[in-house]
Amino acid sequence: QINHASTMQDVANAASLIHAPGLNIMYGDSLGNIAWWAAAKLPIRGTAVHPTIFADGSDPAAQPQGWYPFTENPQSINPESGFVASANNQPDSTRSGIFFPGYYYPGERWNRIAKTVTSKKDWTQESLEDLQLETINEKSVQNADFLLEQVSQGNFEKYEDILSELAEWEGDHDLGHTAPTLYYKWLYHTLRLAMEDEIGKEGFESYLQTFIMIGSTSHFFTHEQNKWWDKKNTSTKETRAEIVAEALKVSLEELTQQFGEGQGEWEWEKAVTVEHPHPLGAKKPLDKLFNVRTEAVEANEESVNKLAFKLNGTGIYKVTSGPAMRILLDFENVEESVSVLPTGNSGNRFSKHYADQKELYVEG
């Protein structure tokens, strides 16, 4: 129905038919209308049911008591702000005032989009390209500043250059910069030293893969008396500052061993790898034939141009997800619309269009 829609209401009606999985439907037309709908069939739960705890399916009280009408779903139609955006964040555009639970990301991307879009009115296709390619994460800057506050930099005089770089970091992930290289290594070891003794190595590595880690790290850092800071296997009680300092020491030693004594050589580019997998490339040696490798990209977590990776202790970060397509469409000049795919239009390894867009995707 969406493909055959001729009005905004037609699209809304079609979106109301989507039950699961939940989708964000974004809309715009040549008349200047814009809209966003959270499309899903949302259950009405009893007060005794908690969305994050397993429920007894045999208990009638745990069953849905009904379904909210689509008109109560989170949505935004021609808002006064003049824009709509979605970045897998907790929506607040609900008519009923209900905040529906879900696996939402923290909101850094949406906040950055909203902040940037509302900062100017003279948007052009070129400036929108810049926004789509932006790799700034303001929350990471806050985390880095907090970590730096916990240590006496006089104890790390040998590493004054890299610490100064991190102190001046604005959250970008430019490939030639060194601040991200230190930040993510330091972040990993701080969390590891705080948590691994309580939940074990396997549990900690599993924790790093969760939404909880992404959403709670800043809050975790702010609790000085948090019991996580104390190591269970020692007779003394470690403090937050001691754990953060130890994590920095380990991080600097590992980066020196990994990239050399010259701190200016610790560029983010050297810590990032990119490979677009093909179903037939899952097993070696077919990966060398079917998978598409590219130059390094500005890997990051939760920026507008999200090129995500899993935090780990190796100091090498493999990009695991990114924009499936970038597209800019001007309804006043549709013929000049532009788009790019991560690799190419064809899934046929022997087609000339199999990977002919990979460089353009990397460069933007």
Over which residues does each language-model region extend?
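C-terminal/peripheral segments of proteins
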Residues: 1-164, 168-364
